[in-house]
Swiss-Prot record:
The keyword Iron does not apply. One of its GO terms (biological process) is photosynthesis. Chlorophyll a 2 binds at residue 26. It comes from Populus euphratica (Euphrates poplar). Belongs to the light-harvesting chlorophyll a/b-binding (LHC) protein family. GO terms for molecular function: chlorophyll binding; metal ion binding. Chlorophyll b binds at residue 28. The light-harvesting complex (LHC) functions as a light receptor, it captures and delivers excitation energy to photosystems with which it is closely associated. The N-terminus of the protein extends into the stroma where it is involved with adhesion of granal membranes and post-translational modifications; both are believed to mediate the distribution of excitation energy between photosystems I and II. The keyword Lipoprotein does not apply. Residues 15-28 have a biased composition (Basic and acidic residues). This is Chlorophyll a-b binding protein 3, chloroplastic.
Length: 28
């Protein structure tokens, strides 16, 4: 799920959760 979000803008809704999951995966 990718949306055109301006740089510096926080993620909102499910997209933010998905982004968090991706961060966790990359953190491994």
């Amino acid at each position: 799920t990718t949306k055109p979000v301006p740089s510096g803008s926080p993620w909102y809704g499910p997209d933010r959760v998905k982004n968090r999951e991706l961060e966790v995966i990359h953190s491994r």
